[in-house]
Amino acid sequence: MAIRPLHDRVILKRAEQESKSAGGIVLTGSAAEKSTRGEVIAVGNGRILENGEVKALDVKVGDTVIFNDGYGVKTEKLDGEEVLILSESDILAIVE
């Protein structure tokens, strides 16, 4: 299934998170934190400015990003895989 986000929305695939603590203990369930890194798999056309112009997004498909996993992040299933839909403003950094 193809998906195209609107405006300043970005669709991410969450990166796999290590499930061991620094001391080597295997973490399960709620003890294992979800990663706040992801790969951009789709981007919208851009943010609509007050004057009506569209400003292109700073992130692009294939970027690895660090994001704020809080209010406003929507989780959906796409072809059996979990994806996240969020605004570009919820992205904190691009990993280079």
Swiss-Prot record:
GO terms for MF: ATP binding; metal ion binding; protein folding chaperone; protein-folding chaperone binding; unfolded protein binding
Primary subcellular site in the record, as a coarse category: cytoplasm
Pfam families, alphabetized: Cpn10 (PF00166)
Gene3D superfamilies associated with the record: GroES chaperonin
GO (cellular component) term, any one: cytoplasm
Localization of this protein: Cytoplasm
UniProt KW keywords: Chaperone, Cytoplasm
Highest taxon listed in the record's lineage: Bacteria
Biological process terms in GO annotation: chaperone cofactor-dependent protein refolding
Database matches in HAMAP family: CH10
Function: Together with the chaperonin GroEL, plays an essential role in assisting protein folding. The GroEL-GroES system forms a nano-cage that allows encapsulation of the non-native substrate proteins and provides a physical environment optimized to promote and accelerate protein folding. GroES binds to the apical surface of the GroEL ring, thereby capping the opening of the GroEL channel.
Family per record: Belongs to the GroES chaperonin family.
The protein's assembly and partners: Heptamer of 7 subunits arranged in a ring. Interacts with the chaperonin GroEL.
Name of the featured protein: Co-chaperonin GroES
